């Protein structure tokens, strides 16, 4: 089984959401993962303690603490530099992945020979109640059309080949 490196950057998310986010990745049906957690708020002791405890408890976690707040793009690039997986996935620190997200996305990516895939999302409120859906286009022409208006990939839902990010040299700070 190929390794999927999951990038999760955090700055000031409430701990209850951060825990749910981490647990949703650690409990995936696809278990050959590396969860890279980048802490971009080293002054927040409660978060640092929680993340360090997770890293001690699960060897799949690579925990990185930025020396100061460097922003999301630089944090993502720091995570990419530490990724060991053939595939890279994104996860936000206040989102919850379905149990089979990575398994389904990897299967779809491999069967279709795509470089990157994303998915729709269910919107939930602070109590976990479903309040709506974020649907993205799947037809090639619709995807091209949406690109004119800012894109259609929900960033924390994608999974892609590592080679794509190497070719692009990571995230660009100009966006």
Task: Identify what each model region corresponds to.
Residues 1-26:
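N-proximal low-complexity "stem/linker" segments adjacent to membrane-targeting elements
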Residues 6, 81, 138-175:
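Conserved nucleotide-sugar donor-binding catalytic segment
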Residues 17, 46-47, 76, 97-102, ...:
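Acidic donor-diphosphate engagement hotspot in glycosyltransferases and nucleotidyltransferases
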Residues 22-65:
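Acidic donor-binding segment of Leloir-type glycosyltransferases
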Residues 66-83, 104:
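Glycine-rich, basic loop-to-helix element that forms the pyrophosphate-binding segment
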Residues 88:
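Short aromatic/hydrophobic "clamp" motif used to bind/position activated sugar donors
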Residues 92-96, 120:
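The conserved acidic donor/metal-binding loop of glycosyltransferases
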Residues 100-132:
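Conserved donor NDP-sugar-binding/catalytic core segment of glycosyltransferases
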